[in-house]
């Protein structure tokens, strides 16, 4: 693989930007989720007995435990963590000097602090992925203290390879889990049609894509399955550069499709950031630069023969990908009806056997590819000039390789927990090491909690409130379907945690979701912070003047409307069908509600602490007030618009200055080369010749002086 300076820069900038979105999204929701009057007050996690700080950090690594030392309330500590994360990550996006290992270590520690105390609301798959990708960014980013003279080291390709291994695990595990769990929607290839309406937060474009012919949506399901299983196996670790580029663009296309039809989630952004590991610097060079570098190069017949062989192998891989798709999914073109039929040609048992055999093979492919990168980096270190430089490069290589080996070994543990895979390939020592560092979430499992696609429609919990128990009014959140006439919302890259948990809670009853009792309690009490999670606009919330006396929850199944079949829903985007009662009507004195609150620990009384009056506490209050009534999507959109504006100003300024930075006198002095003796002798001969008769007139001298390099300078 060639140089990776540019894709590494893109990866580090992308991770920093994703961190900024994640911290800002959590910050907006802290009062409603974790405040003293929130759904899951974070104060309840504070230790009842005073424990040494070091002991508390060892039990649960989080900066929350520093709150008493800073004179801050638990909620304010979370706000401080988020604000520090936003500032630090934006600094890394805008300033290249801040894209340092120390910066990414701080960002990872800040987000880990949120994750360990965030409960169910912060335990989604993209949170786990952000922690692992963020930790790898610590290894990928340069350590400025050790690289004062150079921003590139020989082991950079090795650390950047770890990003590719993570991207492979994410893509392959997600693709395999669709079929390994026996999901019938993927085996009959109707999954994409149902997925468009059953995903976390469908957009308006998803409604239009859902109207496409059934055969075209089945073909789309084939593309999604083949892109998640076959293409990563054949392209991600291929020694042929064009195959890796093919894998990159396929995954980029899929992620853009998910963003446009299912809102922009952190999972999609992280997948794009990880996909940069398939690129190299040559891909970012312009054609003119490539031609300029190849002008003096002439190919021998042996090089031409090798290039032809590589091209044949590449074409064979493309042909195999196409042939396997046609064979496994029985793709046939019906020229009369102008359609392509598709049907799976394998059973769940056959696929499970395939996964069991391919698992160990993928691990060994990873080991071989990792070994190649490590040996290649070591050879580059050995070729360094100077004994001291060579020794220093080898020391860095040894430390980085040891860390990479440890992370690679740890990643095999969650990778083997995928449905259909075996954990017998994991060594006991590796399992012990994994358990020892599990609380730091250095590696994660992906595809393990695969949610089967609902073929009966999109399940949604609809809250209803009433004053008298006779007239009920719906309380619909901002970022999920409620009123069938409301246009599908745009949320991304904001991550609405409450809507996400309500979507996942449909698989189980309210008894298995302790946070749901806390939600009902706060809505019955009329707490503004929790109401703000549902609607920031008071006019959209029916009980803004007085909280309801009773609240119940119903379970509906939503479907996209069909403009041809649904003649009665011409102005509606959804049609829904009532299924059952999710939660019976309760009030604040209901014994069932109080029992659920007791069981989940939310009924516990904590002493009301007097408001702290420290300068830091007052500053946090001042920062919170202006955005209290703004939606999370608006806050993050404003943040991204600010970053885009700064980059635009930079581009405009660079175009006016010709893209050159002003040079200092010291820089000019350093760049001056000492004159060669031959140049001095030649100059003396020229001067003696000019002193002879036949001198130039004054006008000619003036012209010559204007042409002088010194004059132009």
Where are these regions (language model features)?
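Alpha-helical membrane-anchoring segments
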Residues: 1-713
